[in-house]
């Protein structure tokens, strides 16, 4: 009897550990995009930026991938109604965005050209384009993927996707508006900045969490988060600095990974499909994640790491932005490559949850 009891205790302990690592919820409520407001825009819509001062939402787009159609288009929407207030033509296709609201600059990643264009949000005119990739040198050639701003240290971090083991991390001095550093052998994909903690967290296509010094941009630490699984390809990370954790979106494998920021230790797996964007809302203690292939957005409780709600979308949700009052979530939603319908923006009223 004692032996049976010991076996039962071990079984319950193993079950508890498994549940703690793989947190889910059978009580999650499902919404559809029809519960919210949407606005069709056009083809090739990618990242979003919310401007509090103008009460505007910017959406970057690359309308065509034809070789002779390299122009980009930035949509400026009224944040409340999603009415299109302006269509801003750009010389290069636009994908990634980062907004410096105080200095009225919207940084736009030109993926295919390996550059970043600076847009004056007061005039809707381009200020300049920073050419980061050097096509004449294979060691310095890469496509821009993500741009993330560190306002405190006046830096813009830009990930460059190159050939295998040839990824680059560009550091732009935003005061001088010029390239300050180029870091190699990091294979960066996505970033998140902890300005107060003077840290920059980088996730890589090889499943690494990389930590940089926010003051110097120098490497402090790099660790494989889940070395047992070689299939990881981390796209983005969101920070919950109050709890000292990060939430990682992985495009190759299922689950949102919750990691300890100072060590890279894997703490939890939140059961979800493979992911693209991830965003943390400290005001509501929620994490939002887009799942392109499964056409849904997850709302995760950051206090319990359990799924709270699911929003089903008609097309493929891509990028996210949050209003300054933390009550509205915006998502860009993409159609399939051969679809005739326009990509669109979804405005999600979080007070409905």
Each language-model region and where it sits:
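Bacterial N-terminal signal peptides
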Residues: 14-22
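Bacterial N-terminal signal peptides that target proteins for export
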Residues: 2-13
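Predominantly soluble domains enriched in secretory-pathway, periplasmic, or organellar proteins
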Residues: 24-353
């Amino acid at each position: 009897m004692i032996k049976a009891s010991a076996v039962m205790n071990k079984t319950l302990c193993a079950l508890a550990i498994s549940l703690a690592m793989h947190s889910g919820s059978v009580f999650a409520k499902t919404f559809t995009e029809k519960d919210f407001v949407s606005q069709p825009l056009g083809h090739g819509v990618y990242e979003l930026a919310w401007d509090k001062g103008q009460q505007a939402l910017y959406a970057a787009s690359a309308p065509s991938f034809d070789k002779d159609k390299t122009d980009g288009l930035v949509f400026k929407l009224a944040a409340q109604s999603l009415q299109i207030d302006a269509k801003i033509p750009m010389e290069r296709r636009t994908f990634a965005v980062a907004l410096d609201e105080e200095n009225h600059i919207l940084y736009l990643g030109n993926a295919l050209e390996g550059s970043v264009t600076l847009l004056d949000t007061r005039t809707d005119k381009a200020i300049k384009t920073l050419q980061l990739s050097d096509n004449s040198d294979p060691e310095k050639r890469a496509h821009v993927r993500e741009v993330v701003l560190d306002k405190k240290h006046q830096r813009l971090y830009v990930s460059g996707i190159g050939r295998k083991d040839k990824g680059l991390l560009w550091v732009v001095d935003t005061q001088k508006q010029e390239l300050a550093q180029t870091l190699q052998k990091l294979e960066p994909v996505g970033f998140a900045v902890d300005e107060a903690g003077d840290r920059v967290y980088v996730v890589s296509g090889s499943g690494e969490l990389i930590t940089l010094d926010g003051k110097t941009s120098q490497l402090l630490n790099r660790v494989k988060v889940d070395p047992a699984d070689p299939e990881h390809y981390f796209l983005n990370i969101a920070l919950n600095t109050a709890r000292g954790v990060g939430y990682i979106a992985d495009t190759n494998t299922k689950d949102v990974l919750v990691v300890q920021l100072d060590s890279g230790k894997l703490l939890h797996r939140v059961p979800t499909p493979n992911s693209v964007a991830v965003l943390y809302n400290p005001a509501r203690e929620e994490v939002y994640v887009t799942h392109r292939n499964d056409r849904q957005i997850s709302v995760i409780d950051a206090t319990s790491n359990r799924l709270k709600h699911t929003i089903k979308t008609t097309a493929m949700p891509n990028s996210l932005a949050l209003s300054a009052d933390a009550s509205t979530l915006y998502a860009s939603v993409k159609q399939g490559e051969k679809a005739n319908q326009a990509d669109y923006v979804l405005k999600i009223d979080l007070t409905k949850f």
